[in-house]
């Protein structure tokens, strides 16, 4: 795979950090973004010299614009933009407070919208590019009630992603739009969720390195939808059949 310039938000830990390290080993140039300066610097250090680390609050448009502009100033182009930043919460519907609602919507949804709004105009001018939005299996199958508002925010990410795909399909066919749907992943994401992470029915967690490896392949060979866990893809299909008597439409029926 030829060297690409890749922006990754939420790069200070979890999937973002693992993805960054794998891409760096393959010779790509990275622009890494997160709020936590110390942790972000440590990830950038593990990636080796020549990469860019930009302390970024993804819930602020001006920060996302600054991330884009700093990347273009350093590398002169952007090939791939990965909207990875996110935060979990463990609250049932009737337990969610206004502050928690705002936090989860801002980090999981607003940040994705801002990322799309700052990079897609550049991709359109350039005539090509690849946008990768991180969602969740729970956006398709709301399997656990205590992930209520998190699942809802990620469902909205799916809708935004598909709407953008429709907007660009005919006018800009060389701009790839990908949606990634992880199931459970062995990271600190659940531990750091607001309210912790209660025990309950769940898929066996995937190793974060496995998920990152699948995303590296997605960047090499773009496709509309990636379920990182085949079991979650099958459960999603079964959910649609059981609930609606039909298979999921469009890209959601793709592995």
Where is each model-derived feature located?
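Conserved glycine-rich cofactor-binding loop
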Residues: 12-13
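Conserved glycine-rich Rossmann-like NAD(P)H-binding loop of the short-chain dehydrogenase/reductase
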Residues: 26-43
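The beta1-alpha1 cofactor-binding region of Rossmann-like NAD(H)/NADP(H)-dependent oxidoreductases
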Residues: 56-66, 98
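Substrate-binding pocket helix/loop in short-chain dehydrogenase/reductase
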Residues: 92-93, 100-105
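Active-site helix of classical SDR
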Residues: 116, 153
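Residue(s) in the substrate-gating loop at a strand-loop-helix junction
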Residues: 136
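C-terminal helical subdomain
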Residues: 179, 197-235
């Amino acid at each position: 795979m030829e060297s690409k310039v890749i922006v990754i938000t939420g790069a200070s830990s979890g999937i973002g950090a693992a993805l960054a390290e794998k891409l760096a080993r393959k010779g790509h140039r990275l622009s890494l973004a997160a709020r936590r300066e110390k942790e972000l610097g440590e990830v950038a250090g593990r990636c080796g010299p020549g990469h860019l680390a930009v302390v970024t609050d993804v819930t602020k448009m001006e920060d996302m614009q600054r991330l884009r502009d700093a990347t273009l100033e350093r590398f002169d182009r952007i090939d791939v933009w990965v909207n990875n930043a996110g935060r979990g919460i463990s609250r049932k519907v009737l337990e969610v407070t206004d502050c928690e609602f705002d936090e989860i919507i801002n980090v999981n949804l607003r940040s994705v919208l801002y990322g799309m709004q700052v990079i897609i105009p550049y991709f359109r001018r350039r005539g090509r590019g690849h946008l990768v939005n991180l969602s969740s299996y729970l956006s398709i199958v709301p399997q656990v009630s205590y992930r209520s508002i998190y699942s809802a925010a990620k469902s909205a990410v799916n809708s935004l992603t598909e709407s953008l795909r429709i907007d660009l399909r005919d006018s800009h066919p060389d701009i790839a739009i990908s949606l990634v749907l992880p199931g459970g992943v062995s990271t600190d994401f659940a531990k750091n969720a607001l309210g912790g992470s209660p025990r309950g029915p769940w898929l066996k967690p995937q190793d974060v390195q496995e998920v990152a490896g699948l995303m590296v392949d997605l960047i090499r060979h773009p496709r509309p939808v990636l379920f990182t866990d085949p079991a979650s893809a099958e459960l999603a299909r079964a959910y649609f059949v059981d609930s609606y008597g039909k298979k999921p439409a469009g890209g959601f029926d793709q592995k």
